[in-house]
Amino acid sequence: MFHLQGPQLLQMLEKSLRKSLPESLKVYGTVFHMNQGNPFNLKALVDKWPDFKTVVIRPQEQEMADDFDHYTNTYQIYSKDLNNCQESLATSDVINWKQHLQIQSSQSSLNEVVQNLAATKFVKVEHTQCILYVMPETARKLLPSLPETKNLPVGYGAPKAINQEMFKLSSMDPTHAALVNKFWHFGGNERSQRFIERCIRAFPTFCLLGPEGTPASWSLMDQTGEIRMGATLPEYRGHGLISHMLAVHTRALDQLGIPVYNHTDKANKIVQKVSHNLHHIAIPHGWNQWNCEPL
């Protein structure tokens, strides 16, 4: 595959991916941040240029030194042609199947491609599918033709009021990574904690400090520009903190011109209710992640 290098080509890629939203969302969000300084030192590969059919975003080889670190060994894929995608990935060394890795996409149709490739590479695959939400201002800007966008009310959804005497708005610090790691569904280990620290250093974060002066609720961003890892300490749940956090984080990113989206588990009815109240739009085909391990 062809490695796109230099700001001009990456900006052209971003513009082209924008025409394929929402299916290209995970890759579009990643390329957007590659064009804003590329804090995760990622690279973009295409099957051909400029009339590409398949795009793969991945870390530089030197970043992927730990074969068991699937948080770092993460690939984002978008394809206009699934046969082309399978052929491009099968006949190249773009994906290092000897490592523990993750593939992410906002195309559920990639499942067959990933499963077929994994079978030939002797790799075990676990597919996780979640609800993928786009925030209202991002939908108005990037997805104006969606019926749900046309029905959006003016302005932002109102978050639940919080006790602003008790909870103070702040930003996360890398020293808070252990706390985030403890409550992150996909975390709980040393590698995930290092990934969280990197996200805190690289992207805008928000938290509400509780009476003790430590985070009671928080939300972060990952290398694809997605709001992730949000949580509230058990003793402060039920006070509307995560709703407030999402609203504040979203508004701040909107003002910076950053596309805003997030995902939640299909079983997480609380976050789904929050998203509904804040007028988030669920995207077809959802959020997809394939965790791959060599057999």
Curated annotation (Swiss-Prot):
The keyword Acetylation applies. It comes from the Eukaryota. Its EC number is 2.3.1.192. Disulfide bonds: none annotated. The modification N6-acetyllysine is found at residues 43, 48, 80, 182. It comes from Bos taurus. Its main location: mitochondrion. InterPro entries: Acyl_CoA_acyltransferase, Glycine_N-acyltransferase, Glycine_N-acyltransferase_C, Glycine_N-acyltransferase_N. It catalyses: phenylacetyl-CoA + glycine = phenylacetylglycine + CoA + H(+). Belongs to the glycine N-acyltransferase family. The modification N6-succinyllysine is found at residues 48, 182. Mitochondrial acyltransferase which transfers the acyl group to the N-terminus of glycine. Can conjugate a multitude of substrates to form a variety of N-acylglycines. Catalyzes the conjugation of arylacetic acids with glycine but does not have activity towards any alkyl-CoA. It holds the Pfam family Gly_acyl_tr_N. Keywords: Acetylation, Acyltransferase, Mitochondrion, Transferase. It is found in: Mitochondrion. GO terms for molecular function: glycine N-acyltransferase activity; N-acyltransferase activity; phenylacetyl-coenzyme A:glycine N-acyltransferase activity. The lineage of its organism: Eukaryota, Metazoa, Chordata, Craniata, Vertebrata. SUPFAM superfamilies: Acyl-CoA N-acyltransferases (Nat). GO terms for cellular component: mitochondrion. This is Glycine N-phenylacetyltransferase.
